Amino acid sequence: MRKLILLMLLLCAVIASGCSENVPPKEDAKNATTAAVQEKKDISFIVYRAASDGSEKLLPEKIMMKDNGKSLPENALIALVTTKPQDAKMDDVVPIGTKVRSLKIEQDGTAYADFTRELAKKGQGSYGEMMLCYAITNTLTEFPEIKRVQILIEGKKAITLSGHMDIEDPLTRNTTLL
C-alpha cells in the first residue's frame, strides 16, 4: 500500500509541475518603442527649390526620410520648409522661421496649405515671392490627388505674400519654371 501511495504522490507532483503557467517575459516600454522605430520604413518625395543662378527655374530635389505617419504631401511640405538644399545649385526661398500649420486636401483636388506669418515676410522681391509660391505649389502638385494649392497665412487667405503676386485664388502647377 505504501508503494501505491508513494507512486500516486510522485504522479501528482509530476502532473502539478507540468501545469504551471508559462508566461513569456514582458518587453519593457523602451524596447517596444525602439522596435517600433526600427520598423518604420523610408519614404521619398520631390520638393522644388529655386535655381541659385537666378534663372527663374525650380529644380527638383529628392528627399528621403523615415515615415512619421503623416501623409506624403504633408511630409513634402514640411521638408520644403524645414530642410536646406543639398545641392549648391539650389536656393532655399522659404523665409526663416516659417512653419507649416496644416495641410488639408479637398476631394476636388484643392490643397489648403496653412503657414505661420513668417511666410509673408516682407522684402522678398517679386522674384523671391514667385519662386516661393511655385516651390510650394509645384511640390504639392507632384501628388496626383492635388490639382491646385491655396496658400493660407495663419488660417486665412492672403491677397499676396509681399506685394508682388496675387495668391487670393488657388495656384496651379507652373511648368514653365521647371
Predicted regions and their residues:
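Bimodal "functional hotspot" detector
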Residues: 2-178
